[in-house]
């Protein structure tokens, strides 16, 4: 079995934090299990780890600290998500009704090589596969590694709606290997990019981070039978489903 290798570019995420909060994260000395950093205006900052959530400091987050992170973050998309170029980290904003950012979730993105060993026979079967699971259990990590492995011998195109598979910026993260990546201007246009990927770029495999709308399911059905699709969907019941179409 392939040994797992993890890269996370964590310093790039810590660099956007105010220095006092960065030092608090580093003082926790548990970076390998760090999942998210939570900054909400008027509340104490916290860090979420695999097994616990801790308070980083007793001082409440100020407007200046929210603005500090906001100014060092890439532009937020229509879904209030942003990233850091050439990394897999995701920064999500909470806004008030006037549009000002009042909360931030900084999620650590990790490339984990070797994660698909247990299902490699499934992803190489030539069938379309839908991966089901709760948010945060590693569905995107599996898709990213599957795209890298399949791209060694097949034409793979990733439809990367939130830039979580290939990372932020115009150049995809090395973790996707030779797979090509198409970005999506707005989440509601994902189904159009799915169709465009098949019609314009002749893939043997398409990889979609999440299929959650009826139009996206319909777009998956229009793909020729020779094109297999790997995708994920949020659910409370983890599973892997073979499917001739996404239902």
Predicted regions and their residues:
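Conserved P-loop NTPase nucleotide-binding/switch module
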Residues: 202-203, 207-247
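P-loop NTP-binding catalytic core
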Residues: 57-58, 69-129, 169
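N-terminal accessory targeting/assembly segments
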Residues: 1-87
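P-loop NTPase switch/communication element
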Residues: 150-197
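Short, ordered loop/turn segments at secondary-structure junctions
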Residues: 42, 134-136, 161-164, 186-189, ...
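P-loop NTPase nucleotide-binding module
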Residues: 108, 119-164
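Residue-level signature of catalytic and energy-coupling elements of molecular machines
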Residues: 37, 91, 160
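Well-ordered alpha-helical segments embedded in enzymatic catalytic cores
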Residues: 90, 118, 142, 190-196, ...
